[in-house]
């Protein structure tokens, strides 16, 4: 069985999840970002089909405590020296804006591409799954379920619980993902060739945290 490598883009905890500003203070928000990213990465590491995890972030400690099993890459930096990963665009910004799918303009898409290129360079032959780091309910068995559904598809994606966003993006070897993250990304990913996977609505793979209402999710850490 071909192994999967996971790419997890994580924002600087100090600036992530801006839409939760009214529900959580800055420290609580930063703590929540770290806690959710750590929970997501732990689920991936415990999944049977995942060989390794690459975290892409502008923060030196996006997981709070570094894990020796995780490769940490810096977020791509724009030519003016500013980090390209803003908070615009829901799950992380970076709408394509009409550029070629393999050359994202900036933001989350650029971070995803950096992680994918690292995997392609260091683990040739591996499949790639991009997982947003805000899935606190995600279980290892749910990760394996998604990857088994995606194993025979060149490119696929997992829609969020609302059916409009994207929580996971997959590409089997030798294909590369075409990231189109931002509001309404599920439709854009489908248009770019990532077929939607029929993952159960109750799966933690679909329950991301973006809005205050999402904090009521059973597995969501309270506060931080």
PLM feature segments, named:
Residues 1-20:
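N-terminal nucleotide-binding beta1-loop-alpha1 segment
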